[in-house]
From Swiss-Prot:
Homology family: Belongs to the polypeptide deformylase family.
Pfam assignment, any one: Pep_deformylase
Residue numbers annotated as active site: 139
Catalytic reaction list: N-terminal N-formyl-L-methionyl-[peptide] + H2O = N-terminal L-methionyl-[peptide] + formate
Name assigned to this protein: Peptide deformylase
Keywords: Hydrolase, Iron, Metal-binding, Protein biosynthesis
Length: 172
């Protein structure tokens, strides 16, 4: 296993939809292992393949069921798709490994149903609410070429983009 570099905004790959995965092969299994190590090292709740520079529709996540549990264990979703949404909620203080040093309130659905396949190619259907619903929406957005800053007000988004441009200019 290896730690992977996390791609950050404004990298162009983050703004492009990912390619669907057709075969689960040894390379994909290695990618899952490397993404898992990277997720826990970061630390984060979820990580999409595109966030480590891989143009594949896959994500890994590990979300505690409630405040008292440590973890539900790592889950892998390949070619995930949101098939049902319900209710509205604001994800407070949402952040992202690819959008460092910025957090914002983000409008999300309160409940989602997600379908995809796991790392063994078995069909998966997840009915999620609460934090899990927010994490799944956030990571699936990555696979569709969207960042959470694309879902916030244009004023907050442009403030962040200006800050990043200024920092990049200062770096040379």
């Amino acid at each position: 296993m290896a730690l992977l570099d996390i791609v950050t905004y404004p990298a162009p790959i983050l703004g492009k939809p990912c390619k669907l995965i057709e075969d689960i092969d040894e390379d994909l299994v290695c990618l899952v292992e490397d993404m898992t190590e990277t997720l826990y090292d970061a630390p984060g709740l979820g990580l999409a393949a595109v966030q480590v520079g891989v143009d594949k529709a896959m994500l890994v996540y590990d979300v505690a069921e409630d405040e008292n549990s440590e973890s539900t264990g790592l889950k892998v979703l390949i070619n995930p798709k949101i098939v049902h949404t319900e209710g509205k909620v604001t994800s407070e203080n949402e952040g992202c490994l690819s959008v460092p040093e910025f957090r914002a309130d983000v409008p999300r659905f309160a409940c989602v149903t997600v379908e995809g396949v796991d790392h063994e190619g078995k069909p998966v259907k997840i009915d999620a609410e609460g934090l899990l619903a927010i994490v799944l929406q956030h990571e699936i957005d990555h696979l569709e070429g969207k960042l959470f800053i694309d879902r916030i007000s244009s004023l907050k988004r442009s403030m962040y983009k200006r800050r990043v441009a200024k920092a990049l200019k200062a770096e040379g």
